[in-house]
Regions:
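Radical SAM/AdoMet-radical enzyme domain recognition
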Residues: 52-75, 82-194
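A detector for short, charged/polar N-terminal pre-domain segments
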Residues: 9-15
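Canonical Radical SAM [4Fe-4S] cluster-binding loop centered on the CxxxCxxC motif
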Residues: 16-55
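A short acidic, helix-capping loop that chelates divalent metal ions and anchors anionic groups
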Residues: 43-48, 132-139, 199-205
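Accessory C-terminal segments flanking Radical SAM cores
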Residues: 200-275
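Residue-level signature of catalytic and energy-coupling elements of molecular machines
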Residues: 27, 191, 274
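Conserved beta-strand segments that form the floor/walls of ligand-binding pockets within enzyme
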Residues: 22, 26, 74, 163, ...
Length: 275
């Protein structure tokens, strides 16, 4: 990484010429779910609480990165909203004058609607891998499906842009691709299909991978090709964007296994312990 100036503005540029202006901050390793593809059944060894960044440290680091040209900050976890001082962190980061957003499992967002609005958060990514209540319980090892959907409706009704992240696993939820697409018919939400990635302890198996090509092929079985529109990708976007003609919402595919996107990466990732 190196600092360069362009029109007297600082920016962070790596050895490959990529400018990094998007900061992802994990504010906790804790989560109130136990998703099978994310966490082994026996759990994981968490970093000691004394090593986790304080709210002051998070805000101080974020301010430094904003001064170095960062334009967008995303809060992640674990589940960011289980952190006890999450509200304070959100409020303080909302004063930095950059785009602020979050990836969450959605279970606690009802407690933060007004905080989100005050901090300028207008969109959230919600993790939801199935539309089947029993499958949800199976994959998350928790029974919160109805509560999650109540919160998704709450976000939509409060005019937040909702993007639903769906990790596809062959033989488990790939049969629901069209069901997810149909969610976009009348509601302006975005479904983001994510290829199942290797992760330490998640029992990754290549045979469980549903590829970008297979996802589109499945959609083609129900919609004529001319009705599946390829829409514009944003610069440095990790997703390939599409929508069904005349549908209110859209869908995209993050093909991180079959089409790695590191060449245009603009992200800086900060772990909960500041690394």
């Amino acid at each position: 990484m190196a600092l360069t100036t362009e029109n007297k503005m600082l920016k962070i540029e790596d050895l490959h010429g990529r400018v990094h202006d998007y900061l992802r901050i994990s504010i906790t390793e804790n989560c109130n779910l136990r998703c099978t593809y994310c966490m082994p059944a026996e759990g994981i060894n968490l970093t000691p609480k004394s090593h986790i960044m304080t709210a002051d440290e998070i805000v101080s680091i974020a301010k430094t990165f904003v001064a170095l040209g960062v334009k967008k900050i995303r809060l992640t976890g674990g589940e960011p909203l289980v952190r006890k001082d999450a509200r304070t962190i959100i409020e303080r980061l909302g004063n930095l004058g950059v785009e602020l957003t979050m990836t969450t499992n959605g279970l606690l967002v009802h407690e933060y609607i007004e905080t989100f609005k005050a901090a300028g958060i207008t969109s959230l990514n919600i993790s939801l891998d199935t539309l089947n209540k029993e499958k949800y319980k199976q994959i998350t090892r928790r029974d919160h499906y109805d509560a999650l959907w109540k919160n998704i409706h709450l976000l939509v009704n409060n005019n937040f842009k909702v993007r639903i992240n769906v990790v596809l696993i062959k033989g488990f939820n790939d049969c629901e691709i069209l069901d997810f697409i149909n969610l976009t018919k009348d509601v302006n939400i975005q479904i983001r299909f994510i290829e199942f990635m290797p992760f330490n302890g998640n029992q990754w198996d290549k045979s469980k991978l549903v590829t970008y090509a297979e996802i589109l092929e499945k959609i083609h079985t129900h919609f004529p090709l001319e009705n599946i529109l390829r829409t514009e990708d944003k610069p440095n976007d990790t997703a390939k964007n599409h929508k069904i003609k005349f549908y209110a919402g859209s869908f995209s595919v993050i093909s991180s296994v079959t089409n790695p996107f590191c060449g245009t990466c603009n992200r800086i990732r900060l772990t909960a312990d500041g690394k």
